[in-house]
Amino acid sequence: MLFRSRMENAAGQVMTVRGESLGGGKVRIVRINGVEVDFTGEYNALIVVQQDKPGVVAHITKILSDRGVNIAFMRLFREEKGHTAYTIVESDERLPEGVDRLLLENPNIRDVMVVQQ
């Protein structure tokens, strides 16, 4: 069964997510804002919307490493070179409070969504 969800943050930015039910309460996300992605939502996750530029992924991993977050899975998807990209980071442990604010200090990061289990 397919589903679609529209989310809006406090700043009014909208993210549309499309996924499918795998049964037993499990889902797989297959699109974010029309871009093909693939993650299950079985872990705590960060969804980072960013400009496709060098150094952004390094910023993300440094922030997480400095806070002792172990990355279980990490995937990068982009619309096209140099345009909007999406980094999905999944972790076994809960993500630290305020990690979204720290990530947004990078001017190439547009939005961060934290999904806790």
Can you describe what each PLM-predicted range is?
Residues 1-117:
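A conserved regulatory-domain signal marking ACT and ACT-like small-molecule sensing domains
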